[in-house]
């Protein structure tokens, strides 16, 4: 019984650090607006985001002096503004913390801006991992 106490204490003290990993089907529903945008299929998106963030909406990654946020790993160097990087260009005009929730509306709008400016290869996982053989990424209900 004693080893359970520290685990319980950690889950009470740090409830906000729990990851929210979406399934392919959940993500397909949330990303409807992106399907076919700039000729990128939903299966390409699911594959790319799986290899970018593990489909985790709350993930942050520190990367060469900037931080990347959420399922799309949106950087505070250019796309959003954070406390750590208040000098960001903030092209998406959004606080980075907004990309760490399960409401993907603002994430999708920013992803569309990134796509318009840089294309799908902005997400480095796309070209080597998500350019072909995408059947496994389709939502099958």
UniProtKB/Swiss-Prot annotation:
CC annotations in GO: extracellular region
One record GO biological process: defense response to Gram-negative bacterium
Keyword Phosphoprotein: no
Glycosylation sites noted in the Swiss-Prot or TrEMBL record: 64
Keywords annotated in UniProt: Calcium, Disulfide bond, Glycoprotein, Lactose biosynthesis, Metal-binding, Milk protein, Secreted, Signal
Positions contributing to Ca(2+) binding: 101, 106-107
Localization: Secreted
Sample GO molecular function, one term: lysozyme activity
Subunit relationships: Lactose synthase (LS) is a heterodimer of a catalytic component, beta1,4-galactosyltransferase (beta4Gal-T1) and a regulatory component, alpha-lactalbumin (LA).
Function of the molecule: Regulatory subunit of lactose synthase, changes the substrate specificity of galactosyltransferase in the mammary gland making glucose a good acceptor substrate for this enzyme. This enables LS to synthesize lactose, the major carbohydrate component of milk. In other tissues, galactosyltransferase transfers galactose onto the N-acetylglucosamine of the oligosaccharide chains in glycoproteins.
Similarity-based family: Belongs to the glycosyl hydrolase 22 family.
UniProt protein name: Alpha-lactalbumin
